[in-house]
Swiss-Prot record:
It catalyses: oxidized coenzyme F420-(gamma-L-Glu)(n) + H2 + H(+) = reduced coenzyme F420-(gamma-L-Glu)(n). Belongs to the [NiFe]/[NiFeSe] hydrogenase large subunit family. It is an enzyme of class 1 (oxidoreductase). There are 12-13 Fe atoms/(alpha(1)beta(1)gamma(1)) unit of the FRH. InterPro entries: Coenz_F420_hydrogenase_asu, Ni-dep_hyd_lsu, Ni-dep_hyd_lsu_Ni_BS, NiFe-Hase_large. Gene3D superfamilies: Cytochrome-c3 Hydrogenase, chain B (1.10.645.10). This is Coenzyme F420 hydrogenase subunit alpha. Its EC number is 1.12.98.1. Heterocomplex of the form (alpha(1)beta(1)gamma(1))(8).
């Protein structure tokens, strides 16, 4: 006889979500559904009608875990709408900011999954390693972008200022010194994850991967014409779940996809492994890739070069697209600027892409492994909330106009 297992909210993630699993007599998941129950904030609606420079400041507050990708995706979208060509040094500083954020965010995830993989006798060493890596990565973001949480120096047209030559040398030396610690930490985490003994094939699915760049992002690799979005009542076969779900379902070429570290490794480094262990391994390896890129940028950066372009902020109504590879995957912001005001704004964020893939990925294994599958995606639900309940009496969701966050 089928039984329903409900985990609400799922734990060790940002925001609130629910995992509903139908299981057979042996406890094996036959149907998995994962959905956001985090309420909408409506930040995209808040920026509509305002001056372009307000958008990055507001939408970076979509989430306290991933403000860097949202800031960068916002300025990239507005740059595109206003046809701004950002100077090379400005582009490098933006990428440096994101590369350091990748290292920091992936280290945070290792803290969240530590109870799953790290034995008690190694817990203190692992957490101290996470803390040291985070401290140094956040220092880079602070120095380059102004603040580690809400970066004030990332601007439309580029960056507020270049860093000094002294700062470049200090950051370069600091990251070179950090490299052995990151290498050691990655080796430790991969070893512990692979030795855990999770079932072979756990979390494997047949959905395609989607990524635009190994570290930063490339709007030319995201085709808006191949993207569609459906409401939850058209996706979930359970009407009650469809009513409660707070995110839309994005599709690429008509299919739900996986975004994130494994997707980037698949698309740009020929990574072949699939499933939960592969996702954790890819995320750990990406820490090394991101750190190496940050060091390369500091070696390449001309601190005397301009970092911001002049531009006319009036705009013509062109739809601009910003595609940024956040730690959790592809973060796409879209903006239209006309007559000096934002006429339209929408964000399509990583966890929104992953939600329809995560639930079915739990199927075929005992339900006790369900949370392992979910945590492998490092979900961020505040970012993923897209649907507003408009009738408290019957819990119906808005149909004709979606609120996208």
């Amino acid at each position: 006889m089928s039984e329903r297992i409900v985990i609400s909210p799922t734990s060790r993630q940002e925001g609130h979500a629910e995992l509903v699993m139908e299981v057979d007599d042996e406890g094996i998941v036959t149907k998995g559904r994962y959905f956001s129950i985090t309420p909408v904030r409506g930040l995209e609606k808040i920026v509509t009608g305002k001056a372009p420079e307000t958008a990055p400041v507001i939408v970076q507050r979509i989430c306290g875990v991933c403000p860097i990708p949202h800031t960068l995706a916002s300025v990239e979208a507005i740059d595109d709408s206003l046809d701004i060509e950002v100077p090379k040094a400005g582009r490098l500083l933006r990428e440096l900011t994101l590369a350091a954020h990748h290292v920091n965010s992936h280290a945070i995830h290792h803290f969240l999954i530590a109870p799953d993989f790290v034995p008690e006798n190694l817990m203190a060493d692992a957490i101290n390693s996470v803390s040291e890596i985070r401290k140094n990565a956040q220092y880079v973001v602070d120095m380059v972008a102004g603040e580690g949480i809400h970066p004030s120096d990332v601007r439309i047209g580029g960056m507020a200022d270049n860093i000094t030559e002294l700062a470049r040398k200090r950051l370069y030396a600091r990251l070179k010194q950090l490299k052995p610690k990151v290498d050691e930490h990655v080796e430790l985490m991969i070893g512990l994850i692979e030795d855990k003994g999770l079932p072979k094939g756990l979390g494997v699915h047949n959905q395609p991967t989607l990524a635009s760049h190994q570290i930063y992002g490339d709007r030319t690799k995201f085709d808006l014409d191949r993207f569609t979005e459906v409401m939850p009542e058209s996706w979930y076969d359970d009407p009650e779940i469809a009513k409660r779900a707070c995110s839309t379902i994005p599709l690429y070429d008509g299919r739900n996809v996986e975004v994130g570290p494994r997707a980037r490794m698949v698309e740009f480094q020929g990574f072949k492994e699939r499933g939960v262990v592969a996702q954790h391994v890819a995320r750990a390896l990406e820490m090394k890739t991101a750190l190496a890129r940050a060091i390369e940028i500091l070696d390449e950066l001309d601190t005397s070069a301009p970092v911001r372009a002049d531009f006319d902020e009036r705009g013509t109504g062109k739809l601009g697209v910003g595609a940024i590879e956040g730690p959790r995957g592809l973060d796409v912001h879209m903006a239209q600027v006309e007559n000096g005001k934002i006429q339209f704004y929408s964000a399509l964020v990583p966890t929104t892409w992953n939600i329809p893939t995560m639930g079915p990925a739990t199927e075929g294994f005992h339900h006790e492994y369900g949370p392992h599958v979910i945590r492998a995606y490092d979900p961020c639900l505040s970012c993923a909330t897209h649907v507003m309940v408009v009738d408290d009496e019957d819990r119906s969701v808005i149909r004709d106009e979606m609120v996208r966050l």
